[in-house]
Amino acid sequence: MGVDPTPPADIEDFRQHHPFKLSHSLDDALSDRRIEGVVLATPHALHEQQALSVIAAGKNLFCEKPLTMTSEGAKRVVSACRRAGKVLGVGHERRFEPAFEEVQKLVSEGALGKILLMDANVSHDNFRRLAKDNWRLSPESAPAGMMTAVGIHMTDLFIKLAGPAQEVRARSARLIFQPPAEDFVSANILFKSGAIGAFTALSITPFYARFTIYGDAGWVEVMSKANVDQGKPTTLTHVDHEGRRTVVYEATDTVTQNFEAWADAVEGKASYRFTDDELSENIRVFEAIVKSTRNNGSAVALR
């Protein structure tokens, strides 16, 4: 079943090739006992209320990122899933990219030594084509520039690699876009491990994506040629004290892989690769970044 209160004009053409029942109300899906899980891909500000409704109806939940807009909201959703014995999936598909799976392997095996710095920039100008009143440009549903679009993926990877955060400083700015949209967000995150995570995401410049992790025994860098939906290859470079290794990975359908991993967890075939603590921690960091941008880049402590 598909639910959309305002479906696009070409929805019937799509349904001719991919038949499914269309409803205008989420309640129809929640009351259908045949439905075991619900995927939420709605404006971010609606996530928490809808997620809790899905769990209360006895369904497994897959929610597009960010899970919620606040850390308290994330706690409520994670706790509700845990109490109900349901599997919580989140749309952080970058962990499923072959290059980032290799990065996680290198870090977990100690190939980079102690992680010192994680530095990333993921930017694109897709938002130039959006109408001014699009919710993706709204400070209520999408605060701090591109934080909810791409920044939240980077912080997810940071947390996976370095653990929980201790302090956040962040700034956003508007030099080109007209209000309420913002041109970029840049954040500096101190982790409890002592590592630093720094990232920038611009919403006004052509595509660029680089993710680099530096350790005392080596560094690894991932360069993407295009956004995940474009099917372009990604290049990984690993340098240690013995030399340089470069690997080119062809694109894979990471969105589907994430859905399949969630479905496998629902069926008890495997554990989902995201922990509740990681999902909650990412929203704590997201909330702190938003707070810092709204307070001229002042430090926000995470306890």
Q: Model-found features: residue ranges?
A:
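Beta-loop-alpha module in the N-terminal Rossmann-like domain of NAD(P)-dependent dehydrogenases
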Residues: 7, 18-80
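Glycine-centered short loops/turns at secondary-structure junctions
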Residues: 58, 85, 110, 194, ...
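Hydrophobic residues in well-ordered beta-strands that form the structural core
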Residues: 24, 63, 88-90, 199, ...
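Rossmann-fold dehydrogenase core element
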Residues: 76-93, 113-118
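Contiguous beta-strand/loop segments that form the cofactor/metal-binding neighborhood of enzyme cores
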Residues: 149, 153-229, 256-271
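NAD(P)-binding Rossmann-fold cofactor-contacting core
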Residues: 1-14
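Predominantly a Rossmann-like dinucleotide-binding segment in NAD(P)-dependent oxidoreductases
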Residues: 94-171, 175-178, 296
